[in-house]
């Protein structure tokens, strides 16, 4: 119990140190909106590939929903507000999400590993750049197990995170594909590498926005993985 709270407290401190750099993630920056649009296209491609066509009928929980930006995207894509939910550790981000999202969207505060959510109640559990902020392996595993428990058979975990360490930021660490598979050993993984390395993206987009697309054609320069981790359906 103490270890769980220690890591949750550490995450809070890491995000507080990161707040000063938030301007780098403004959608007014060309590399940022291109990163977001690329991820959206890849996500929609995964939905189509895996038969998730009726978005309005799907129940989705985002772990680490922040200020609600991803949930707003999902609403625009066709998810219904009453079928969306978010969990957020940081009170100020949770308050911002509550002020932004429809009242029908349920939001949970606090440590997600302690969330009292019904097993197999979600079609999708979405997690975006969360595990890279968790530096305790045991805490990572507990969260992954909770997420897997919430997903119904035939559903899955939608995962987006970076895979390599950032030497300039010791508050995060990359989550390689092998580690992701280790966290969800029963999952069937469909992964694709996306997102031009942010330091490169910032430099080239400053010269011209179109250079993001050009440099992103080189797979070795992509630092993130978007994956659908399918939970096997029950035999019929």
Regions found by a protein language model. Give the residues of each.
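A short SAM/SAH-binding and catalytic strip from SAM-dependent methyltransferases
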Residues: 124-138
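A short glycine-rich, Lys/Arg-flanked "PGG" loop and its adjoining helix->strand segment in the class I
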Residues: 141-153
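Short alpha-helix
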Residues: 171-187, 191-192
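A C-terminal cap/extension of S-adenosyl-L-methionine-dependent methyltransferases
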Residues: 178, 192-236
């Amino acid at each position: 119990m103490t270890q769980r709270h220690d890591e949750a407290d550490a995450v809070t401190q890491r995000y507080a140190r990161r707040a000063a750099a938030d301007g780098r993630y403004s959608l007014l920056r060309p590399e940022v909106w291109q990163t977001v649009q690329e991820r959206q296209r890849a996500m929609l491609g995964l939905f189509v590939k895996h038969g998730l066509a009726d978005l309005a009928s799907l129940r989705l929980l985002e772990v680490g929903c922040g200020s609600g930006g991803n949930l707003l995207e999902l609403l625009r894509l066709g998810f219904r507000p009453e079928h969306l939910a978010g969990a957020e550790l940081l009170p100020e981000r949770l308050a911002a999400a509550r002020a932004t999202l429809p009242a029908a969207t349920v939001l949970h505060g606090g440590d997600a590993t302690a969330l009292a959510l019904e097993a197999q109640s979600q079609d999708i559990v979405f997690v975006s750049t969360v595990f890279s902020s968790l530096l305790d392996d045991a805490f990572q595993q507990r969260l992954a197990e909770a997420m897997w428990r919430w997903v119904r058979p035939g559903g899955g975990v939608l995962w987006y995170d970076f895979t390599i360490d950032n030497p300039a930021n010791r508050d995060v660490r990359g989550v390689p594909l092998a580690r992701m598979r280790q966290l969800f050993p029963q999952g069937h993984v469909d992964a694709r590498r996306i997102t031009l390395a942010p330091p490169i993206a910032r430099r080239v987009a400053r010269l011209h926005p179109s250079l993001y697309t050009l440099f992103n054609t080189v797979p070795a320069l992509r630092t993130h993985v978007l994956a659908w981790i399918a939970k096997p359906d029950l035999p019929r």
